Amino acid sequence: LKYLERTNKSVDRMINIVEDLEVISRLETDEYQLDLQAFNIFELASEVIDAFEMKASQMNITLELINESQTELVIGDKDKIQQVLMNLVSNSIKYGKDGGKTRVRFFDMEANMLIEIADDGIGIAEDSLDRLFERFYRVDKNRSRDIGGTGLGLAIVKHILENHNQNINVRSTVSVGSTFSFFLNKAD
């Protein structure tokens, strides 16, 4: 039974790698089209938080959704932005500390909305920040075996946001936590 469980986990991991590689290859081709529309980012983030509630609870991590914006409507490809939020929240939980928090926050910045995903997890060393969004790059290769993932999530986030003419930013301190942030245009 133990062998079957390991095999099943390996198959799931391979499926995730293939799916992530497919996403990356589509993002890098001219075939990639954004379906830009106005949508409620707060509702979308609530759905993402709900999807991770059980995983966060199992790891004793509290999820918080904080809206400090006067509006909730942004312009973007809703499905792609959902993938961005899923990847960032998932990483925040995976690299979080027992009893820690993951916060998804929204701020008004003139014609844009600033979206932040912050945690009080293990943090990232400054010398790793430049390579963080490269395919398959893992900050702590020894620890990442236990954590799982494909090493493609942040590369996907970067490509999606670049296709929205936006950037992903990161601030991090080892043993203090990380904050990933990006802008989306507000809907009029």
For each of these PLM feature ranges, what is it?
Residues 165-166:
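Conserved glycine-rich
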Residues 99-111:
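Short beta-strand/loop element within the Bergerat-fold HATPase_c
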Residues 35-40, 57, 62-72:
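Conserved catalytic submotifs in the C-terminal HATPase_c
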